[in-house]
């Protein structure tokens, strides 16, 4: 059988692509080296932020607004346990923060619902938060967080119900191109398709070693909290920048545990074996202490944590482009630790590519050629 589309990597983007392409009527094969959702990539740990006024640059705003529409649609499949939780997101940092300047600019350009607070206003609204006098907060009322593993599980189930073929726990070992399309090699045999999507995450260079993607080991952890820090008490998800430039992100507490991670830093790695479990690097359990001690002093000790991996591009912007010399293969990689919120729209973009539809978005900033 020759498929319309083969998806290599069925984590966040691949799961979405499988669903949207199958829903569009294509004959699709989803593949993954493991059984998604799983612990081997970048999507585990239960939750991911979604921010609309984007500190990484306004070029992302049209994408994230469409992503939000798709997340809302997906959430309707899980109304008892919604995939998207509109907790709000408070972005904290010094008044001269470049990141916060980008958030404010994005909000102004796209007329987003963002409220600016000074230090006293932040602490009055959320007494659990402490910030210096020179800090400001930009509160995104309509943003919140996503249940990442539930989302992937839902997409995979919906795709399967729609007739999508799924080959999991079976790594793709090679990709070949010829006049007939794309062929992948696996331990289960060879499979052919007219087109392919490569969204293999951290280890995409195992298949395409020439790509400018650097795996980085990262950790996040859960710390002892209480009901004051919960969504029920209107405690928001957050990003926070310390005076030294270190950037953190976190979520409202659930079951008396508040999850937090540090966005910058981490350990450069070159193989999956180098991504050692949480606590095997001496700094893992204390990485969030500078932020917690200064901004959330009521949070207690580290309860547990996990390691994941970023697939960083050189400029930490996404790579969304066809494979050089092979216009029938789309790369979506280099998501650099801020990609999950876009998984829905990136999956839709992949499905459009498979149908020869022109994208509704300007993807020029994400081309591979910018690194030449």
Curated annotation (Swiss-Prot):
Enzyme Commission code: 1.5.3.-
EC class name: oxidoreductase
Binding positions for FAD per the UniProt entry: 4-34
Keywords: FAD, Flavoprotein, Oxidoreductase
GO MF: flavin adenine dinucleotide binding; N-methyl-L-amino-acid oxidase activity; sarcosine oxidase activity
Cofactor stoichiometry and binding remark: Binds 1 FAD per subunit.
InterPro entries referenced in this protein's UniProt entry, alphabetically: FAD-dep_OxRdtase, FAD/NAD-bd_sf, Me_Trp_Oxase_MTOX, MTOX
Keyword Acetylation assigned: no
Catalytic activity: N(alpha)-methyl-L-tryptophan + O2 + H2O = L-tryptophan + formaldehyde + H2O2
Cofactor(s) listed: FAD
PANTHER family for this protein: FAD DEPENDENT OXIDOREDUCTASE DOMAIN-CONTAINING PROTEIN (PTHR10961:SF7), PEROXISOMAL SARCOSINE OXIDASE (PTHR10961)
NCBIfam families: PRK11259.1
General function of this protein: Catalyzes the oxidative demethylation of N-methyl-L-tryptophan.
Family that this chain belongs to: Belongs to the MSOX/MTOX family. MTOX subfamily.
Subunit structure, interactors included: Monomer.
Protein name as annotated: N-methyl-L-tryptophan oxidase
Species of provenance: Escherichia coli O7:K1 (strain IAI39 / ExPEC)
Protein's gene: solA
